[in-house]
């Protein structure tokens, strides 16, 4: 019996990370989606066709009770995204209602503590540095300034008193870190190794999910070591990972699973590396 138990534990530990979910998906309700076919029904079909057990709708959201929204975000309040409810049902897929909120340059988070109760999962990006809302003109002027902000924003988020068991940190290697690819890669190169180790040890302790984002994975082509470095360090520090297509269109949905598969192989992820949403 002891040998059987050891063998079973070894099997579970060595089991390849299963691609069975997508926790970052936008519908046409998000203002930056321009695909009328990107409906909840189409998203559910994507999940069923790929054998997923869980998905989450995460349209852009800024809580109307929190000051500091941009004009673009202020229109995407709770009533706006709740138009998606009720979500379609499936016997095979749990379809969660979530949101992608924002954090401005003053580290004001666009969701109140009370509002978390209305969502099954909340995606929080720290790398939307293409938005004036999130970075000063001075910091945004150089890759060095952007690298400093990359660190301080993630640090600031992790210092907050939040229900991290139902939060994912989105696209940490996103191309929106900088406009030009050369600058984007330079920012990622400038992130200090020790700071990354410290931040991801902190993230692991908090129990927050780290997103493997389809867009980040696409951006890794030809620059794998640079773009995937934060995730390699996150894995080493004990972080747990979830998958997010960040799809705003049906074409992006269709491309997601292949990208996820590449990232799982590149990072050699096992089931024990998987983030599970806690209520």
What do the predicted segments below correspond to?
Residues 3-28, 184-279:
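Charged catalytic cores and adjacent phosphate/nucleic-acid-binding surfaces used
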Residues 62, 102, 173, 217, ...:
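Short, glycine/serine-rich, charged loops/turns that create anion-binding
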Residues 16-152, 252-254:
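A metal-dependent hydrolase metal-coordination microenvironment
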Residues 43-47, 114, 157-160, 203, ...:
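Generic structural signal for hydrophobic
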Residues 51-53, 118, 163-168, 268-270:
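Short loop/turn motifs at secondary-structure junctions
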Residues 29-33, 124-130, 134-237:
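Domain-core and long-helix interface of multi-subunit machines
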Residues 10-12, 85-86, 111-113, 157-160, ...:
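Short, flexible, glycine/charge-rich loop motifs used to bind or transfer phosphoryl groups or to couple energy/partner
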Residues 65-67, 171-173, 177, 250-251, ...:
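Flexible glycine/acidic-rich beta-alpha junction loops that bind and position SAM and/or redox cofactors
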């Amino acid at each position: 019996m002891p040998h059987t138990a050891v063998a079973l534990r070894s099997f579970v530990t060595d089991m390849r990370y299963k691609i069975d979910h997508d926790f970052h998906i936008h519908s046409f309700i998000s203002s930056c989606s321009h695909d009328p076919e990107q409906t909840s029904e189409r998203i559910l079909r994507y999940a069923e066709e790929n054998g997923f057990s869980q998905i989450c709708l995460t349209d852009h959201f800024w809580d109307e009770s929190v000051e500091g929204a941009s004009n673009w975000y202020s229109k995407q309040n709770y009533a706006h995204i709740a138009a998606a409810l009720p979500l379609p049902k499936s016997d095979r897929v749990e379809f969660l209602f979530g949101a992608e909120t924002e954090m401005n340059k003053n580290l004001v988070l666009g969701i109140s503590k009370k509002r978390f109760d209305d969502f099954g999962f909340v995606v929080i990006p720290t790398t939307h540095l293409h938005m004036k809302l999130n970075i000063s003109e001075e910091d945004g002027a150089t890759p060095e300034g952007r690298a400093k902000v990359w660190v301080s924003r993630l640090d600031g988020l992790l210092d907050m008193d939040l229900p991290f068991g139902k939060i994912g940190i989105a696209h940490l290697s996103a191309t929106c870190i900088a406009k030009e690819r050369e600058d984007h890669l330079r920012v990622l190169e400038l992130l200090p190794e020790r700071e990354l180790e410290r931040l991801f040890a902190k993230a692991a302790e908090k129990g927050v999910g780290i997103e493997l984002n389809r867009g980040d994975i696409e951006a890794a082509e030809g620059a794998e070591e640079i773009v995937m470095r934060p995730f390699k360090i996150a894995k080493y520090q004990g972080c747990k990972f979830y998958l997010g297509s960040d799809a705003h269109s049906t074409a992006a949905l269709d491309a997601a699973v292949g990208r996820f598969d590449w990232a799982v192989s590149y990072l050699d992820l096992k089931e024990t590396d998987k983030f599970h949403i806690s209520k």
